[in-house]
Amino acid sequence: EKILIDYSEMFWKKHDEMMAKKFGFEKLERYDADFFTSWQKLMEEISTDYTLFFSQLESLEEGSDIIEHFKNSFYQNLNKDQETLVIEFVENYRQRLSYNQISKEDSRKIMQKTNPKFVLRNYLLYDCIAEMEEGKTELFDKLWNALQKPYEEIYPEFSVKRPEKYEGVVGCSSLSCSS
């Protein structure tokens, strides 16, 4: 039982340390676990592409239109209540970021080292397999190259949401327990 308790504590400590880096925080603060939980709830509420969200968070500037800035990471149009949730979250994020002792640029560098620009997505594998069955290897070669440097945006065409044609396709828009 002690092993399970220790594992749980260690897991959540490492999780929170990783999340702090994803958000560009130089160190964990006392209430960061609550901040991460509120972010997770928001992402679930508004159906967001996490990879794109963090990429856009890196480039968020003061004074920018928050909803417009993040709209490419949302899988649906947001209603006013959802927009308010996003705006409030970003305000909380900026407040939390102000606790950093490092520069905004150093914070951004932490984010860039932690948040990949490329994540191999199942729909890309579907397309790659289909092409390879036709004897083509162009997509395979691009995927291979992108996998070698996931923290660099080598192919901007991979930095997009899952195409609508894959909505509802098991393994592309949702995963089963056996996936």
Predicted regions and their residues:
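Regulatory N- and C-terminal appendages and interdomain linkers associated
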Residues: 1-179
